């Protein structure tokens, strides 16, 4: 019970903080596509009319890319205020407000062509992170695609978030994973790696 309660509290703190900064975040990132080459490479492997789930959809920047194509896009995020920002920017589209750990409440096994999780999974505590890989594997169709980002490191901490500083707070829960941990996790399922990109950011 302690682990579940602890994990819930950490996820809930992230949700509350994103509600606080939703408008500022949306203004800066609502239509901004970083690493466009990754999106394009991912798209090369998508089937026609693919059904895509975006875990941690935020203010809809992934929707702003895939809406231009003939795909069935569904967003999922635990921040109601992020959903409101997404609708203000892009108009209404399928968007579920809930914690991504509950994804199997909404999708049956073998029902999705692709799952997209960019800049979101590193807010999950390690046990939830690992369990999500199992859930995603279940809901993907055979030869389905899973694109995700990871913050390389070890352990967990409360990372500085400038937007929160403006709200009288200053940190956001983060959980890190080494490349070895990710590889072990992928190999514990029959996931096949198609491509990866590693970015190294050097602070001044």
Task: Report the location of each language-model feature.
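Conserved class I S-adenosyl-L-methionine
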Residues: 1-47, 49-56, 154
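A short glycine-rich, Lys/Arg-flanked "PGG" loop and its adjoining helix->strand segment in the class I
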Residues: 130-142
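Conserved S-adenosyl-L-methionine
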Residues: 191-202
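A short acidic, Gly/Pro-enriched loop at the edge of an enzyme's catalytic core
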Residues: 106-115
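Conserved beta-strand signature within the Rossmann-like core of class I S-adenosyl-L-methionine
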Residues: 143-150
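Acceptor-substrate binding/catalytic loop of class I
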Residues: 163-180
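Class I SAM-dependent methyltransferase SAM/SAH-binding core
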Residues: 59-103
